[in-house]
From Swiss-Prot:
GO terms for biological process: tRNA thio-modification. The lineage of its organism: Bacteria, Pseudomonadati, Pseudomonadota, Gammaproteobacteria, Pseudomonadales. It is found in: Cytoplasm. It comes from Pseudomonas entomophila (strain L48). The gene is ttcA. Its cofactor is Mg(2+); [4Fe-4S] cluster. Binds 1 [4Fe-4S] cluster per subunit. The cluster is chelated by three Cys residues, the fourth Fe has a free coordination site that may bind a sulfur atom transferred from the persulfide of IscS. Belongs to the TtcA family. Homodimer. The keyword Metal-binding applies. This is tRNA-cytidine(32) 2-sulfurtransferase. Pfam families: ATP_bind_3 (PF01171). Keywords: 4Fe-4S, ATP-binding, Cytoplasm, Iron, Iron-sulfur, Magnesium, Metal-binding, Nucleotide-binding, RNA-binding, Transferase, tRNA processing, tRNA-binding.
Length: 274
């Protein structure tokens, strides 16, 4: 790729700045960390690695980056693509081979979506590998749109007000997951991926599945954004500005103990002079 145009340079700077802000706001990466960057071969993880490699050079702290890809033995998976790309970059990497594809195909009935089981199997394998190599953080390529989509998926289909946090301690307590692209839009990431011409690897297992719940939510958000630009960003900001006393979760706020504060200064409204 040659010299960047003005708009391309702005795009690159914006992604780097937003990732840096997210990392700082949530203390995602600390001095001495060994960050395991999970690469799927998609636009998001390529962009994440690219941005983290830049931040590694300019950050005031020192941290190591190890790229990890999980070969799930999907038919037609181009095994040579990621090793060739990472060797050219000079990045330390590992390819973890585990045939989760066969497990998913065996357990999931024909016509049903494979995403949930596939992601659980992949996540468990990566958690174990992160522990084996001594990684202190595990970086995933989810972006702002993914986080908002997950929020609506949980609300619509699971009856839960939860999303996909920028930083998470895994249930096993031994892994900390970070999402450096949490502030970045999918639109910017797609444009950056196209600009950089990353060697994208399609997912033959789930990429061809239609009518997924997530796709329905994604289409809804795209339509909202088309009619009301900035709505996705506003929803994401709402996730950062939660008021438990204005919701209905009794575990987050003690509604049962609410009483009049006798010491509070009375507020009188002069209704005659409104």
């Amino acid at each position: 790729m040659g010299t960047l145009s003005v708009n391309q340079n702005k795009l690159q700077k914006r992604l780097r700045r937003l990732a840096g802000e997210a990392i700082t706001d949530y203390n995602m990466i600390e001095d001495g960390d060994k960050v395991m960057v999970c690469l799927s071969g998609g636009k998001d993880s390529y962009t994440m690695l690219d941005v983290l490699l830049h931040l590694q050079k300019v950050a005031p702290i020192k941290f190591d980056i190890v790229a990890v890809n999980m070969d799930q033995k999907q038919p037609g998976f181009p095994e040579h693509v990621l090793p060739a790309y990472l060797k050219e970059l000079g990045v330390e990497y590992h390819i973890v081979e585990k045939d989760t594809y066969s497990v998913v195909k065996e357990l999931v009935p024909e016509g049903k979506t494979t995403c949930s089981l596939c992601s659980r199997l992949r996540r468990g394998t990566l958690y174990t590998f992160a522990d084996e190599i001594g990684a202190t953080k595990m970086a995933l390529g989810h972006h702002r749109d993914d986080i908002v989509e997950t929020f609506f998926l949980n609300m619509f289909f699971n009856g839960a007000l939860k999303g996909m946090p920028p930083k998470l301690r895994a249930d096993d307590g031994r892994n900390v997951v970070i999402r450096p692209l949490a502030y970045c839009s999918e639109k910017d990431i797609q444009a950056y991926s196209d600009m950089k011409e990353f060697p994208i690897i399609p997912c033959n297992l789930c990429g061809s599945q239609e009518n997924l719940q997530r796709q329905v939510v994604k289409d809804m958000l795209v339509e909202w954004e088309r009619k009301h630009p900035g709505r996705t960003e506003s929803i994401f900001r709402a996730l950062q500005n939660v008021a438990p006393s204005q919701l209905a979760d009794r575990n987050l706020f003690d509604f049962t103990s609410l009483k009049i504060d006798e010491s509070a200064t009375p507020r009188f409204l002069d209704v005659l002079n409104i």
